[in-house]
Amino acid sequence: MTSVVVIGTQWGDEGKGKITDFLSQDAEVIARYQGGDNAGHTIVIDGKKFKLHLIPSGVFFPEKISVIGNGVVVNPKSLVKELEYLHTEGVSTENLRISDRAHVILPYHIKLDQLQEAAKGDNKIGTTNKGIGPAYMDKAARVGIRIADLLDKEIFASRLKTNLAEKNRLFSKMYESEELSFDEIFEEYYAYGQQIKQYVTDTSVILNDALDAGKRVLFEGAQGVMLDIDQGTYPFVTSSNPVAGGVTIGSGVGPSKINKVVGVCKAYTSRVGDGPFPTELFDEVGERIREVGHEYGTTTGRPRRVGWFDSVVMRHSRRVSGITNLSLNCIDVLSGLDTVKICVAYDLDGERIDYYPASLEQLKRCKPIYEELPGWEEDITGCRSLDELPENARNYVRRIGELVGIRISTFSVGPGREQTNILESVWSNI
């Protein structure tokens, strides 16, 4: 029994797709366990970029099984579009499996997401408007439609009719917006269901059978710990649990079967959307990091907010997710800076604290306490070991490991698979 979980430790966009792709080379099954097509990951293979939002990174390995677990909310329209994109690029999807227990995102979820966000005005959360939150709301309210329901024509029609009647009353009465058509949604989405039914199965059985057989299973998280609905910067969070604990709920695999948790982070910090960000940069250094790091959302295209590395955030992520190994990305983006900074603690009303407050009001008053380190001028994109890094870059990497309290297993100096360097295999000693 060998399993590794890959999670984001910041606010998403840490490079999980790349690291999952890298670790997938030694895995036999790769599974997603939460989120939806609000998650975007970019994978570079042989110099070619592939952008996915829903299908796991493991799809690029035809000999491995790629799983969308029950904790994922699936937009069938987006899924079919992504399948067509992969087929056009010559990528086979025969290895894909989709949980029959996963919930379905429908047009009324997307419309409700947009209307609710618009109604918040200045208090908007910064949602991707993909219908993720409303879909999880229906799931919790026990009125959601699952993939298994989508494939059954009579059940789908019955549940869609009931749900749409309620949603249309909400649209017309509360938001004074146009109602949606039952016939249009039913015909379009039932057809999508038929297009994906070949992939649908009980994925919990597949995952547990694989683990019981001693196969290597890799669980791929979406978003990041700081966007977790319980442990993140609530309410500026997603509607699911990106933390490692979400694996067991979202995949149907018990906690005793999880061996290692790899936390993925950047050598700096980024965030899309609104919410607290203590180390955010508003100067020319921030702009430089954004441009050099191509910090624009994969899903939204929005410019990402950027800031210095925050070890307070990282220690919070380590604690609530039980992170055992760290993967440090984008070190190359910081090349050319005279000085690099790491936030080691916060100043809250004159008191030094080393924890991440739950209160948004306290977070607003938190000022980062920085440790400054000398930067490096060298181009490090060709470095293939820690020893090849310039001394200052090497010291920066080591200091991050010391402050976070997690051993660094891999570090990356560019987007390519070959630019990911192994310090310690996460598949060993399991």
From Swiss-Prot:
Residue positions binding GTP: 12-18, 40-42, 304, 330-332, 412-414
Cofactor: record remark: Binds 1 Mg(2+) ion per subunit.
Protein family (similarity comment): Belongs to the adenylosuccinate synthetase family.
Protein name: Adenylosuccinate synthetase
UniProt-annotated binding residues for substrate: T298, T299, T300, G301, R302, P303, R304
GO CC terms in record: cytoplasm
Residues reported in the UniProt entry to bind IMP: D13, E14, G15, K16, N38, A39, G40, H41, T128, R142, Q223, T238, R302
The species this protein was found in: Streptococcus thermophilus (strain ATCC BAA-491 / LMD-9)
Compartment(s): Cytoplasm
